[in-house]
Amino acid sequence: MKIGIFDSGVGGLTVLKAIRNRYRKVDIVYLGDTARVPYGIRSKDTIIRYSLECAGFLKDKGVDIIVVACNTASAYALERLKKEINVPVFGVIEPGVKEALKKSRNKKIGVIGTPATVKSGAYQRKLEEGGADVFAKACPLFVPLAEEGLLEGEITRKVVEHYLKEFKGKIDTLILGCTHYPLLKKEIKKFLGDVEVVDSSEALSLSLHNFIKDDGSSSLELFFTDLSPNLQFLIKLILGRDYPVKLAEGVFTH
């Protein structure tokens, strides 16, 4: 079985890693839209257009299912993708919500994400339907920190404190509502202390067990729309080793 995964950049590699750890034999094609990262500051129409282009690229590679490893794209484009792309499409939001509701003891749940994801209200609506009190916060500097490899240290600590100080003592569970954010999990957990941190990439990989046939050849192709200088560093940081990368060629508008 061949799985297509796309994200606005390298953050979706956390989803790829979670899927590969659980399903060892699947073939995976990954597309990171590094030329247009971040999606979280774009308009709804632009996010949908970018998502359709990425999904179309993966479909042309012959994938059997598509995983939208970007929370912003999941929030704005998932329903459109399901209508227009003739393969099953899965997003990261619903699995993350289910996991948070299961883990939370007092149903006081925080959500952090890009400005677009938080503005969409996608997490908030689903959590409130589950009876949770929701505290949502956009953390726009987290994606650039992750993309630059600044995963810990003084700068990252100060940015984490700046965004999350209002959560301290108010929540018992936090959803990392962006696939870049697990890269900063160490500093986030250190600052928040005794709070359950939900990684949507892990929740998503678990939710796919009814749809994935673990019967491929374990092949992996990594495509990116821009081969940035720190790309190999980030791939090795997330996946644990170097992998060859290819420049994605196709209809990628700006």
From Swiss-Prot:
Catalyzed reaction equations: L-glutamate = D-glutamate
Residues annotated as catalytic: C70 (proton donor/acceptor), C178 (proton donor/acceptor)
Domain of life, source organism: Bacteria
Temperature dependence: Thermostable.
Pathway in which this enzyme or protein is active: Cell wall biogenesis; peptidoglycan biosynthesis
GO MF terms, alphabetically ordered: glutamate racemase activity
Enzyme category, top tier: isomerase
Binding site for substrate: D7, S8, Y39, G40, N71, T72, E147, T179, H180
GO biological process: cell wall organization; peptidoglycan biosynthetic process; regulation of cell shape
Disulfide topology: none
Pfam families: Asp_Glu_race
InterPro entries referenced in this protein's UniProt entry, alphabetically: Asp/Glu/hydantoin_racemase, Asp/Glu_race, Asp/Glu_racemase_AS_1, Asp/Glu_racemase_AS_2, Glu_race
EC number(s) stated in the UniProt entry for this protein: 5.1.1.3
PROSITE patterns, per the entry: ASP_GLU_RACEMASE_1, ASP_GLU_RACEMASE_2
Alphabetically ordered keywords of this record: Cell shape, Cell wall biogenesis/degradation, Isomerase, Peptidoglycan synthesis
Protein family: Belongs to the aspartate/glutamate racemases family.
Function text: Provides the (R)-glutamate required for cell wall biosynthesis. Converts L- or D-glutamate to D- or L-glutamate, respectively, but not other amino acids such as alanine, aspartate, and glutamine.
Subunit structure: Homodimer.
NCBIfam families linked: glut_race
Entry protein name: Glutamate racemase
Organism encoding this protein: Aquifex pyrophilus
Lineage, opening ranks: Bacteria, Pseudomonadati, Aquificota, Aquificia, Aquificales
